[in-house]
Amino acid sequence: MFQSKISGLGFYVPDNVVTNDDLSKIIDTNDEWIQERTGIQERRHIVRGQDTTTSMGVKAAKIAIERSGISNDAIDFIVFATISPDYYFPGPGVELQKELGLKTIGALDIRNQCSGFVYALSVADQFIKTGMYKNILVVASEVQSLGLDMTTRGRSVSVIFGDGAGAVVLTRSDDDSGILSTHLHSEGEHAKELAVLAPGMGGRWITDILSENDPDAAVVFPYFWMLLKTWSSLKPNFF
């Protein structure tokens, strides 16, 4: 069995620095309160129109590939971890492939919240150990700032999170160096204690969800008219 190792690493954060003092102007908090609880002094937030989840991932990936010493053509798979994709679907993995000018290789998206990169790295590691791929680009990118409650009510969360991206190139190794093993666990019993419940299907029909929004806005749900027609014809067959 092969081993996998990190051959290149890159990261990107937006230019917009948000300090604890900046937050204290809009939230009932202060630098001492934040540092005492988190150790955080500043975080980065995107400026609308300048950065996206995909664009930050692209910038981090370019650095990782350059540092790995391999060419773009040597990348044979992508694993992209995020919970803040640019679109509901397709995921950012395929956008990354396009923007980097890579071959039409596979791109897998992973949504595992804070542990997303760990899961992405583990998946890539297993792909390499089985001999399926040789060089895998693993990317994690998040735009959290646009979904934060920037009021005193949300300060326990909003002072923690920022925006940015990281990337590694995971490469096959014939020696014992690299990732030894990974062990993943979950505890669904407490899932709803840290959850974002919307948007979500929640067992509803697509037509029910759309009725709560503006049906003229096709962006409410991708391929609106195609799905509406398909689901309308299928729905009676389920009863």
PLM region spans:
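Condensing-enzyme catalytic core mediating Claisen C-C bond formation in acyl metabolism
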Residues: M1-R48, G154-L234
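Short beta-strand segments
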Residues: G10, A81, R111, I136-E142, ...
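Phosphate/pyrophosphate-binding loops at sites that engage ATP/ADP/AMP, CoA/4′-phosphopantetheine
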Residues: A60-D76
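Short glycine-rich or small-residue beta-strand-to-loop segments that form or flank ligand, phosphate
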Residues: F77-I83
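Flexible, glycine-rich active-site loops centered on histidine and acidic residues
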Residues: K129-A165
